[in-house]
Structures are given as structure tokens and as C-alpha cells.
Amino acid sequence: MVEVVLDRHRLEDQRHFETAIHATPEVLDCWAIGGRIDYLMRVAAPSMAAYQDFMEGLRQVGLGIDQYYSLIVTKSVKSNSPIPLSASRQR
């Protein structure tokens, strides 16, 4: 997982980042987040060296990334859990 903070928060900067990320196969998922970070991405790489190269490449192509924080998943505790029907009916 990668937490991303953009250097600017204009709509055009967000759209530029999102368009580029959408076309990037290494990024499996990307969510816009409210709070101290702007985006949370799930990234796949065959090795740590490949991951580092990928992230440095993202910083070099002008996507407006100010900072990024790498979070390494060590164990899956719960994954792909559907929303219970009772929760979806409460809308």
C-alpha cells in the first residue's frame, strides 16, 4: 500500500494524477482519501527493487507527488469481504 500526498490540490492536478494512475498497470487499486493523505494505492511489484524503481519513476513524470509513504502488508487478516445484506438494506 502507498499513501500519496500531492503538492497541490487543484482539481486539474487531481485529474492529471488520477488519469495517469488509471493507465498504470502496477497500481491495482487507488482511492481518493479525505484526511492527512490524498490517495491510497495498492501497488504490485515483483521485488522491493522493482517497487522502488516504480515509485521513483512516478515521482519523475510530473504527477505532482509531494510525498509518499510505503506500507508493507505482512499478513492478510481479512480480504474481499462482501457487504452483509443487513448493512446494505440500512441505506
Question: Where is each model-derived feature located?
Answer:
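A compositional/biophysical signature of low hydrophobicity enriched in polar/charged and small residues
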Residues: 1-91
